[in-house]
């Protein structure tokens, strides 16, 4: 789904930057689907493993108004509030006026919480979970669960609806998609995608935001 969504919003010979690119698997797959696209990755912790993918040392090194699509797949749930603000500021600065910010995050409420918590317990070979039984029930019915102070290694308590509210402060959300149940209510899926466009006033004021 990520490759299809980005392919659909990327202009011919466009530039795509993947924030939190890891070893570059997504950009590699995108390059196979769209050989015309320039691929740039940024990751504070990992090096690229695919020779066709170039990494930038920092987001500040990307020229203003030079990017067609900025992606942030499965990373926003691990950012502190100030880091998320910095990412959105960078997006407004580097995106072209008609560019797109494409985000995906896990859905940690609704029915998906049960298999996700169960899977975590199986993988860790433990009967203990970050979630108490009460918190699992709260998450199942869409109630918010408190987040740990450190979001780096956990999804607990992440609420995509709160992220959407923050993003909507600076971007217009053109489209949303759910996986693996795209035509069903969000509480039946486990992943949430947003295609976001800079608001006109935000784009013009990006220098102030940065």
Descriptions of predicted regions:
Residues 13, 67-68:
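Local beta-strand N-terminus motif with an aromatic residue
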Residues 74-78:
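Short catalytic micro-motifs in class I SAM-dependent methyltransferases
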Residues 15, 38, 100:
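Residues at the starts of beta-strands that form the adenosine-phosphate
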